Every structure is written in structure tokens, then in C-alpha cells.
């Protein structure tokens, strides 16, 4: 499928094994796999309706490896929004996001208009937690981005993550419906301007 100029591109970054692919697959296909299969790069698409025209939500699931810096730079330069994933069971995985965030700042420049979500995945493994949510919230405030904890395994906050990311988009109106119900915030937004929902 050729890339369209009106694609809305979301890039997902994070260390290997934090659950990037699991989050994307849970959102796009509603599935979860127990086994870990390293990703080089996969792209998933969802059709969304945006201001009465059709566009595509394109989600790029990037590699957790540091062996492909050129691919990482390309994903950042083409991306409209970013999801930075760490595992709550691994402090190291949170540390590894810092250079990625710095690279996004360097490539994108004006961070005010860039939607970014900091995501603590695997919140179902709380007994093994190494990163407290308060610590991640503080980092998100420093980065001026949103924060959420998720569990791809339990399907906790997965759709909500993508909804919140799209709510952060200031340059155009994009949103998705969760179980056919629209939030009060979404209804308010739609009254103010055009609307975008996942089909």
C-alpha cells in the first residue's frame, strides 16, 4: 500500500522486550502473543475518517535494537506523533528512552506541537516493578508529554493510549471511538471543529 500524504504517522519506540509490538498488535488486531519475537520494523494501518475525508493511521513499530540508527532517524523525521514505551519492570528500559527523546527534539525542533506519550507497559507485573509511576510522571512533566501505564497482556489502557495520543494533536482533529462511545472531551472537541474517528 503506497504511503499517502494524508497518512497520520505514529512511531513507537522503546528497548527490546518492553512490549511495543504487543501494544500495537493488541490495538490493531486485538491479539496478544506470549512469546517474544524481535522486530526490525513493522507498519500497521487503520483507516480513519478525518474532517469528512479518509486518511490512514499508520503505526510504525520500530526495532528495540540500536543497530539501525538510520531507520530510527527516518521514523522520527516522518512521524507526526510518538509513543515512547518502557517496561515498569526495567529501569534500564526507561533510561534507554532518554536519547530517543533527545533525538526527537533534535530532528523535530518545535516540541510544543508534537504529540508524545510516555508509556509504562507491563503494569500487570506490578510485584516486579522497578519504576514507580510517580517517577515516570515527573519525567513526563519534564518532557512536557503525556503519561500512561498499560498492559498489552490484559488489554488495559491500550485503546485509551491511542485515543489520548490523538487528543494531543493540535494541528488537526483526529480521534478514535472507544467501544462506540465518545468521551465528553471528544464530543466537546467535535463541536468546536471537524471530527476524526476510526472506522
Swiss-Prot record:
The modification Cysteine methyl ester is found at residue 196. It catalyses: GTP + H2O = GDP + phosphate + H(+). It is found in: Cell membrane. The lineage of its organism: Eukaryota, Metazoa, Chordata, Craniata, Vertebrata. Ubiquitinated by the ECS(ASB11) complex via 'Lys-11'-linked ubiquitin chains, leading to its degradation by the proteasome. It comes from Macaca fascicularis (Crab-eating macaque). Its main location: membrane. GTP binds at residues 14-21, 33-39, 61-65, 121-124, 152-153. The modification Phosphoserine is found at residues 35, 126. Residues 197-199 form a propeptide. This is GTP-binding protein Di-Ras2. Belongs to the small GTPase superfamily. Di-Ras family.
